[in-house]
UniProtKB/Swiss-Prot annotation:
Organism taxonomic ancestry: Bacteria, Pseudomonadati, Pseudomonadota, Gammaproteobacteria, Lysobacterales
Family: Belongs to the bacterial glucokinase family.
Keywords for the protein's UniProt record, in alphabetical order: ATP-binding, Kinase, Nucleotide-binding, Transferase
Protein name: Glucokinase-like protein PD_0680
GO BP field: glycolytic process
Any one GO CC term of the record: cytosol
Amino acid sequence: MIPTPTRDAPNIPSFLAADVGGTHVRVSVVAAAPTCASPPQLFDVRTYRCADYPSLSTILNDFLGTRSAVRDCVIASAGFQRSDGTVITTNLPWPLSPHRLRADLNLAEVCLVNDFEALAYATEDMEPAQLLHLTGPAKAQDGPRLLLGPGTGLGAALWIPNNGRPIVLPTEAGQAALPSTTELEMQLVRHMLNNRTHVPIEHALSGPGILNVYRALCALQSVLPQHASPDAISHAAAAGTDMLSSQTLEVFCDFLGSIVGDLVMMYGAQGGVYLAGGILPQLREPLLRSHFVERFLNKGPMGEALQHVPVRLIEHGQLGIVGAARWYLNKKAT
């Protein structure tokens, strides 16, 4: 069960948890649950726009205010973590270093975790009301679960059952090469290769990716783009006022279905797929109308096996914080 956040300060030891994306940072004070089976309790959840602040330290300092009792912090963020703790990412507006955060905020401990690794830990707290079933059986088989979602980039992680202490494998699936199936997709990828030697999956499956696909479609049809943002494209598609905007979302959903099917087979994710990220809940209706399921199952003889894999859309904005807190509490318990 996802905890209901409150604004009251906890009377038990607590820590700071943050979900840092390329566009927004969500922050909360977290109190440890009374048992490992209970979800952590969130207090005073706030959302900040990254573009409004010069650094993550500034955001966290604003949130902490006079909370001098909070001494520890866990941060979920996209990117690859180096051995020295710093994060390599193309999607954040500023560097991310636990050493700098610890010094800037006078904290005892700052831990970093991959955002989709954190989200994978939150699957234990999801309720049916937070999930939209897209395909497959209502009950999944036992086995690994795939977490994937487009936002500022494309995040992905694998949750692996392990006798009550699951293992989560963060990945950089969004940096793998973008595959193409149809003639149109091949033309799009060839166009994208005009000014680069590698087209990653997230070049199409992300917020910026929607704009990349739209511009490529415009170029292929020799027309000038009418929209300059993913939101404008989505609004035009919803209003039915621009055929290329509608086609952009169709191509986006086709790519998504095909790639999710590929990753399920690569990772053996028989435990199901959870689609998350900041974009898909906003594209719920185009996704439901799309060929997503058809493309997900279009894997030759393996399509029959994929029919037994449930795919669900996650609709809960605080799961990143909950998952980061779960990860941190598990770390402290070992």
